Amino acid sequence: MREGVNKVALCLFEHNEKAYRAAIRMMDQYGKAAIAHSTGTGKSYIAFKLIEDNPEKVVIWLSPSEYIFKTQLESLKRNDSDFPLVNVHFYTYAKLMCCTQTQLEEIAAQKPAYLILDEFHRAGAECWGESTVALLKLCQDAKLLGLTETNIRYLDKNRDMAEELLDGHIAGDMNLGEAVVRGILPAPKYVTTVYQYQKALAKYQARVDNLRTPGIQDANQKYLDALRRTLEQADGLDRVFAHHITNKSGKYIVFCANKEHMDEMVSHVPEWFTGVNPDVVVYEAYSDDPNTDKAFADFKTDISDRLKLLFCIDMLNEGVHVEGISGVILFRPTISPIIYKQQIGRALTAGDTAAPLILDVVNNFEGLTSISGLQSEMQEAVHRLYANGEGDKIVTERFEVIEQVHDCRILFERLQENLSSSWEHYFSEASIYYAEHGNLNIPKLYTTPSGLSLGVWLVT
């Protein structure tokens, strides 16, 4: 029981309880700890547990957005409306960036016992990092607890933010694959397909056209033509959705790249989704829209028989979970591994048992293999658990992946392999020329003794 309140103390999932205890030990020893747990595993409750266990201590909570913190609080209040938050002060990383030195000193003057860095990999952003580090220097007596799905900034030279901000003290580390293997998150039904692939075909046609050796060009053109024919014969999105969206009145989050992209996708709703349910309602949520709060709230409370689609841009990537989601639909270009995992993670929530649907709809062929990263994580987790004598913790070793365009992926991989070997062939000839002549000042029309148009290759 919580002291002075007729309430039972917060009860963490086993994986979070273990990480919390390790974090307490690390903070006592080093003053800082990081927890890198997959999206959907409830890691914000680790921070709430820290607050509950230290009700008299001042806590400063830093987060990428007010929206994330607000939804985390909503989830907490559903479980415990009297949770003690009087000593918790919330700021966004963006707010810190706008603070003067005096304002940062005023924040530090609250003398926090703890600083919680939520989604702390985001503090590595150039615009946010400096002010965050400045505040940490002003709060040197505070213990630091960092929460993230991954501490690596993949598109920023693989910077390790746990190392930079928390001296590499990681109290808990569990990626999405391990969370699924251990049954903490439900295994999804994963469907891949492509749409609007004409630009991608044109890009590869240009690469094939630039191959000046007839034999090599002809071989690659055959693969590309076969890929084009296979794509033309594949089911359209209307058939894919009608077949795989089995909960006809379910709630689905639809991720888009930007506002223009979202508007275009929404315009296709009648064409693509009427075969699922002719009664479709569309909600839209994006950070610059003042109506977002209402749209999001209406989506969450909608219990009608309509098919409910929440189209959104980036704001639901991290930290925000919606109960009762039947699945997610990703309309996406190539994105970072972090955002990809966060988006598919919106369909996965600890404690759920039903297999959620993930429809991965890509406009580039490279995206067809994205799921292999998660599958590799799962295989590594299975091997590690068996090796550690923890085979009893394995609940799921694999999940269903339905490739609507399986043949396309195989043809694309062969085309990629062929184009790469062609490049290596040209590179090898260029290396030979350089070794013989000491430079690559090759006339554009120069061909090698074997017939390669090396001059043209070098200028293209």
Task: List the predicted regions and their residue ranges.
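Walker A/P-loop
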Residues: 29-49
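Conserved Walker A/P-loop ATP-binding site and its immediately adjacent core
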Residues: 44-49, 53-76, 257-260
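Interdomain helical connector at the RecA1-RecA2 junction of SF1/SF2 helicase-like NTPases
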Residues: 156-252, 266, 270
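Conserved SF2 helicase motif VI
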Residues: 336-352
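Conserved segment of the helicase C-terminal RecA-like domain
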Residues: 347-373
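IQ-motif-like calmodulin-binding regions
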Residues: 402-460
